[in-house]
Curated annotation (Swiss-Prot):
Motif (Nuclear localization signal): 55-63
Gene giving rise to this polypeptide: tat
One of the record's GO molecular function terms: RNA-binding transcription regulator activity
UniProt subunit comment: Binds to equine CCNT1. Participates in the formation of a complex composed at least of Tat, P-TEFb, TAR RNA, RNA Pol II.
Role played: Nuclear transcriptional activator of viral gene expression, that is essential for viral transcription from the LTR promoter and replication. Acts as a sequence-specific molecular adapter, directing components of the cellular transcription machinery to the viral RNA to enhance transcription by the RNA polymerase II (RNA pol II) complex, thereby increasing the level of full-length transcripts. Tat associates with the CCNT1/cyclin-T1 component of the P-TEFb complex (CDK9 and CCNT1), which promotes RNA chain elongation.
Stretches assigned to coiled coil: none
Localization terms from the record: Host nucleus, Host nucleolus
Record flagged with keyword Transcription: yes
UniProt-annotated stretches for the region Disordered: 1-30
Region (Core): 35-49
This protein's name: Protein Tat
GO cellular component: host cell nucleolus
Record keywords: Activator, Host nucleus, Host-virus interaction, RNA-binding, Transcription, Transcription regulation
Length: 75
């Protein structure tokens, strides 16, 4: 009964849904695209976890890239 509870976090969701033997297709799972990181996975679901300060840094980073400069922030 404990296994039927709703996972509390996205990470827990990922762990529960990624079962199976690595490198073998079990037939029950469709091939999933590989994501760079958990944030990329969440973005693919349409979930944006960036808070306001990170959004500002991301905007500054994109602007720097468009102007041909090396961005100050990696995210």
């Amino acid at each position: 009964m404990a296994d039927r509870r709703i996972p509390g976090t996205a990470e827990e969701n990922l762990q529960k849904s990624s079962g199976g033997v690595p490198g073998q297709n079990t037939g029950g799972q469709e091939a999933r695209p590989n994501y760079h990181c958990q944030l990329c996975f969440l973005r693919s679901l349409g979930i944006d976890y960036l808070d306001a300060s990170l959004r500002k840094k991301n905007k500054q980073r994109l602007k720097a890239i468009q102007q041909g400069r090396q961005p100050q922030y990696l995210l």
